[in-house]
Amino acid sequence: MKKKKIEKGSVQETLLLPLYGRKRAMEMYPGNFNDLDCQRIYNEVEIDYNRKGIMEKIGAIMAATRQYDLASVCRSYLKDHPRSCVVNLGCGLDTTFSQVDNGQARAYNLDFPDAIAVRNELLGERERETNIACDLNDLSWFDKIDFHPEDGIVFFASGVFYYFKTEQVKTLFTAMAEHFPGGKLVFDATKKKGLKNMLKTWLKDCDDNIGVYFSVDELSELKSWSSSFSSVIRKGYLTGYRPLDKRYGFVLNTVFKHLDKSCMCQIIEIRFK
């Protein structure tokens, strides 16, 4: 089969980067991560990120661990709500639903139109799965989710809210809590210090006032946003959902523990009343 050529600098290349991290993690640490969709996609495309060394190793571990964390939360929610909606906010080419699908849940994948176009091309829609092209800040997407409170709903976002301003996130989260009672939201976040380094590296044209972008220093501030939040908890991104693998090595595991302890790498879980 002829492989699809992925052009440098394209939307496809950007969306494939997180999958590359998971692919490399599976190759370096067999048995620790499992993403068959990721492997299949990379067998069908021709692309070379040319990333080697310690930074590739760190990026691969972090990308795969983040998916593991978010999948763990979704899987736990589905135990009590097997017919739940599973909503992927800013989905890109994320394949988490295939890791947690119980045969009853319904998936909704949300992203900008260009990202959804790539997703439709490389992944398509499967049974009980709907791809929705939208702007997350335009809350009209709420009405496209076939939500039934008795069935439940769980939202997850992987590497998404770093690029949102705090007021945008507050508006979105509070509206979600009102519209989807009994639901749950899980996402990754960092402190203001970590966000400053991240945005200066990734967003050359970001707002000069980096402080307006979303980060989580004090969990109490996030809790105060809405009386419709029943709980807000924070766990370590790298250590919160399972122990570190000894194969990562002493030095990297020490670094990972520090990142979690200092709250530079966080997973936030919000439960709606």
PLM regions: where:
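Core SAM-dependent methyltransferase catalytic element
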Residues: 245-273
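Short, glycine-/aromatic-enriched active-site segment of Class I SAM-dependent methyltransferases
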Residues: 192-210
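Conserved catalytic loop of SAM-dependent methyltransferase domains
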Residues: 229-254
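Rossmann-like AdoMet
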Residues: 1-87, 91-134
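A short, conserved alpha-helix within the catalytic core of class I
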Residues: 163-176
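Short amphipathic alpha-helix with an adjacent loop that forms part of the alpha/beta core around
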Residues: 140-150
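Conserved beta-strand signature within the Rossmann-like core of class I S-adenosyl-L-methionine
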Residues: 154, 176-192
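Short alpha-helix
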Residues: 210-236
